[in-house]
Every structure is written in C-alpha cells, then in structure tokens.
Amino acid sequence: LPICESWRIPYADSLSSLAASCDAVFVHSSTASHFDVVSTLLNAGVHVCVDKPLAENLRDAERLVELAARKKLTLMVGFNRRFAPLYGELKTQLATAASLRMDKHRSNSVGPHDLYFTLLDDYLHVVDTALWLSGGKASLDGGTLLTNDAGEMLFAEHHFSAGPLQITTCMHRRAGSQRETVQA
C-alpha cells in the first residue's frame, strides 16, 4: 500500500499477522472494537497500549485486565494529556495549589450518543487529567449531570478533594465556544 511504502511500515492483512510481527501494539480504534482487538492481541502474546476507554463496559474491561495478568503481559490504557509537555509542567507546580479546575467546553456537541457514551468517550479525559495532575488520591465530593430529553449529555461538573487541594471538572456540550482550560 502507498502509505505503508512511504512510511516504510510493513503491511499486515490481519490482526493475527500484525500480532505475529510485533512485541507491542498501540490500539486506536472504535471503542466498540476494543474488547475484540485487545483480547486477540493479548491471546497472541502481544503487550498492548489502548486508547481510552479500555472497553465499552466494566465487565469487558475486567476480563481484559484478567487476561493480561494471566498471560503476564502489559496492558496500558493511554490518556494523551498525560504526555503533553504543558500538563507535565503544571503537574510539577501543583504542590502549593489550593484549587485546580479543568474545563472542556464545546459549542455544539450534544448527541448523537447518550450520557454514558459521552462520559466514557469525552468527559473521562477531563476527569482523568485533573485526577492525574492532583496525584490520583482524590475523593469525589459531589457533582451534577444534566441531559436533554433524549438522554444526551448537556453538562457535567464534579468536585473532588485531594487533601487540601480542591478539584473541579466541568464540561458543557452546548457552550458559546470551543475551549479547554486548566487553572491552578
């Protein structure tokens, strides 16, 4: 294939042939395909880093974790903001912060998926980044989820505590602008 040739990437015509030629694979595919793709790779003895979320539901996610443990393979869920240089720099400066707020707003992103899908597909980035920045030892104090009549997410906001650090995460799916901010 031209793209493979231009980047000198060996072509694989199936997941099993790809697995046979790799020690590790990064999976960036639809969430619905994660369980099948990741389990195929793990069963082939390949270490896996998969873009979030690990699976469509908790049961499948737990099955993948158990499979990786049984096979003694690395299974990592990737969140791209954890590797962004500015977020890494901010993380080093949070020791003296009293509050952390992360907002991700979209101007017209309501639907077509339900609340559950949007929480796992998009809002999860906001919560994960905020909790990672805080060191991951936060407890949920409360929050709000708003949907329209079709069950699609309009707004989410949650409040966490990590020792003296107060954390707020927020997403508005029908805001006046596209914006992602972090304040500490």
Enumerate the language-model features and the residues they cover.
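A contiguous active-site-proximal alpha/beta segment in oxidoreductase catalytic domains
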Residues: 32, 55-111
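Beta-loop-alpha module in the N-terminal Rossmann-like domain of NAD(P)-dependent dehydrogenases
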Residues: 7-49, 53-65
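Short loop/edge segments at beta-strand edges and connector loops
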Residues: 13, 29, 50, 77-79, ...
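Rossmann-like dinucleotide-binding domain that binds NAD(P)(H)
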Residues: 108-179
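Active-site phosphate/pyrophosphate- and oxyanion-stabilizing loops and adjacent acidic/basic residues
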Residues: 16, 88, 92, 127-131
